[in-house]
């Protein structure tokens, strides 16, 4: 096997932790000696051993003089688990090949420095682009302390998320809907607007055995959510947060919601609407590193205008609804000129069953130049 193949194996291992490591990154590690793999591992779950220590625990022989390929710079601080740099040095591993750099201020090059001071050879930025693709959520959250927001919607080929009557079940096929279940498992939170709750009475949970359900977040400015809704009734089983902005006649309603296990966040803007930037800061402080936005056109528009959306995933079905009254993914007043559009960069297009999934990165002002260069 080549160096690239060993790192690809580490990437493959890292992906096994998807949905379980948050707010930690996904990391994989492979230990090689005399041209063969003698140990491998990945970070399985938040709070448990890191990839390097799991790889060491799986060793079939001494790692003295071996090379370890790891997708992210090894940690060098005591957290929920001991430092991985110490374990690497103790095992007398001679060389560490690293993919991504760790922007965590507790690490950020300190792990590399510690290894080199101990006489270990370190190679940085090996297949960095491929390794970086594992952890956009972690990189965003650790540097901003706000959730990485993915706007997801299903639409017809003519851009409708519902018919003129509001009917939307089902636009996409079974395979695409199962992928959405996987996405809910992957991200820590799922967010919808009160309009979706009142219209569909959704659970917003994961219905696949063995996958975890996200924290459910409802944007409800005037606190209209019914205590009898499925989301409220199941709040003691699935963590649920309702954000609101208007305190008028809400005291009794808040008491009821709290009694039923619902958390509330008051975050108004100057117009008594929810300040989404403040909400993201609050959710980040509560340890929520990522959000799947399953809103309607109004909430999607507000989220884009607030600048909180980092990625868009659109599932496109081979259907046409037609009609000017059909609902669209992003509503509001729209832009006046094409030059005012939200710029996106395609990152992946694939077929899932009968439908197409399109992934795009949102190009904010800081990213605009690189997006234009790479598009």
Predicted regions and their residues:
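Enzymes that bind and transform nitrogen-containing heteroaromatic metabolites
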Residues: 3-17, 22-24, 63, 80, ...
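A broad detector of short, well-ordered amphipathic alpha-helices
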Residues: 8, 12-15, 39, 50-53, ...
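A short, flexible N-terminal coil/short beta segment enriched in small residues
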Residues: 10-14, 29, 34-41, 130-143, ...
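Proteins enriched for Cys/Gly/acidic motifs involved in redox and nucleic-acid/cofactor modification
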Residues: 19-21, 112, 126-154
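Short, conserved alpha-helical segments within structured domains
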Residues: 25-27, 127-130, 295
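Short beta-strand scaffold segments in enzyme catalytic cores
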Residues: 26-35, 153-154, 358
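Zn2+-dependent cytidine deaminase-like catalytic core
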Residues: 31-130, 215, 241, 246-248, ...
């Amino acid at each position: 096997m080549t160096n690239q193949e060993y790192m690809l194996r580490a990437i493959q291992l890292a992906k096994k932790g998807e949905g379980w490591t948050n707010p930690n990154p996904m990391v994989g590690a492979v230990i090689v000696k005399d041209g063969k793999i003698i140990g491998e591992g990945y970070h399985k779950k938040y709070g448990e051993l890191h990839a390097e220590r799991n790889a060491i625990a799986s060793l079939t022989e001494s790692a003295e003089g071996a090379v370890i390929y790891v997708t992210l710079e090894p940690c060098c601080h005591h957290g929920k688990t001991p430092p991985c740099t110490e374990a690497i040095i103790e095992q007398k591993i001679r060389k560490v090949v690293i993919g991504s750099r760790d922007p965590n201020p507790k690490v950020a090059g300190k792990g590399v420095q510690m290894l080199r001071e101990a006489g270990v050879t370190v190679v940085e930025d090996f297949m960095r682009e491929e390794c970086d693709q594992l952890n956009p959520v972690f990189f965003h959250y650790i540097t901003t302390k706000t959730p990485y927001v993915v706007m997801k919607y299903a639409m017809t080929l003519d851009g409708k998320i519902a018919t003129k009557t509001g009917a939307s079940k089902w636009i996409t096929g079974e395979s695409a809907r199962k992928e959405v279940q996987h996405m809910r498992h992957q991200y820590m939170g799922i967010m919808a607007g009160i309009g979706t709750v009142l219209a569909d009475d959704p659970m917003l949970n994961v219905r696949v055995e063995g996958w975890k359900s996200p924290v459910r977040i409802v944007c409800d400015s005037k606190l209209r959510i019914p205590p009898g809704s499925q989301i409220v009734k199941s709040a003691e089983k699935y963590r649920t947060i309702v954000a609101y902005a208007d305190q008028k006649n809400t005291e009794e309603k808040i008491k009821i919601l709290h009694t039923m296990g619902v958390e509330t966040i008051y975050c108004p803007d100057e117009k008594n609407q929810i300040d989404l930037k403040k909400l993201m800061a609050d959710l980040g402080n509560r340890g929520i590193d990522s959000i799947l936005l399953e809103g309607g056109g109004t909430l999607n528009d507000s989220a884009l205008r607030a600048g909180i959306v980092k990625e868009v995933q659109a599932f496109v079905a081979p259907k046409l609804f037609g009609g000017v009254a059909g609902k669209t993914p992003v509503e509001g007043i729209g832009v006046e000129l094409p030059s005012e559009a939200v710029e996106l960069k395609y990152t992946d297009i694939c077929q899932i069953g009968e439908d197409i999934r399109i992934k795009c990165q949102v190009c904010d002002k800081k990213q605009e130049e690189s997006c234009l260069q790479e598009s």
